Amino acid sequence: MESIIDAHCHPTDAPQELHLVANLSVGKLIVMGTRPTDQKYVEQLAKEYPGKVIPSFGIHPWFSYYLYDDLDKDLQSSETRKKKHYEKILTPIPDEDFINALPNPVPISEFLEDARRHLKQYPNALIGEIGLDKPFRLPVGPYDARSSLPQGPLSPFYVKMEHQCKVFEAQVRLAAEFQRAVSVHCVQTYALLYSSLAKFWDGRWIPSKTKIRKMKKEEYENSLAEERKHYPPKICLHSYSGSIEQISQFSAHKVPTEFYYSFSIGINSRYKNFIQTLKGVPDDKLLAESDHHSASQIDELVRQSLNVMSEAKSWTFEDTITKISSNSKAFLKVT
């Protein structure tokens, strides 16, 4: 599977297995950042295995509460900031003991500046894992700086969607600025995800197919050059769990960003409509992923994902390898 790219994985969560990365059968891994404390681990892995690891930097919606809006006048005082921040973004409002156990929040601007530095240093880097997650509830500690998996039982407290959107859109804006691909997590809120993303291209010049046919290639490229600065070029909806109808919405001609859809066995096999959804994805927009935290499991999980794609699309396994490899290269602009 040398030509296959694992479109979404988290091997930095299992540092004891990172030595296995070099000998994986998959050709490359897109390794996700999820929270302020793990961006450095993603960077370290990319430095150690530059030919194998494509880094992706971002704040997952599960960790969006780590960031506070430093433009909010109510959060200027360091003495009251933590309490006010969590009271603003969590619902219902937690008690003081719960808030005290939470990490001290980081300014959004500080994270974005750090991500900007990473993007400059790694021209192939993505933004991710970012997104929106409606049913997510905060865990009841302890808070493990190394793991992206919830530790302990879940609390009754949710991160308000308003705050999730603020953190998400700030990162999409950064992806647009640097023209980088994005890996997106979305659970039970695809309509809100679409409306959040549509802000970036609404009102922009998007020529009709007839207009495109009449334009010379150079004229078309020049006309779009300025418009492209306002939205990311490509977005992967990872472990996609939306409907086939929503695929049509994201992939409509009026949407200038190219949408890809990746699938993992661990997540997508839970859904009874998994095979039907796979059938509904355009053949050239399908990607494979493990979405796993252990390097030792990545090859097998990617292989299982490819097997299910073969079944759903009625492709041979060899044809599936060829098609998914081509799609991965197109997503990353790899030639």
Swiss-Prot record:
SUPFAM superfamilies documented for this protein: Metallo-dependent hydrolases
Annotated GO MF terms: hydrolase activity, acting on ester bonds
Lineage: superkingdom: Eukaryota
Entry-linked Pfam families: TatD_DNase
Any one annotated GO CC term: cytosol
InterPro entries referenced in this protein's UniProt entry, alphabetically: Metal_Hydrolase, Metallo-hydrolase/TatD-type, TatD-like
Similarity annotation: Belongs to the metallo-dependent hydrolases superfamily.
Record's function text: Interacts with cut9.
Protein name: Cut9-interacting protein scn1
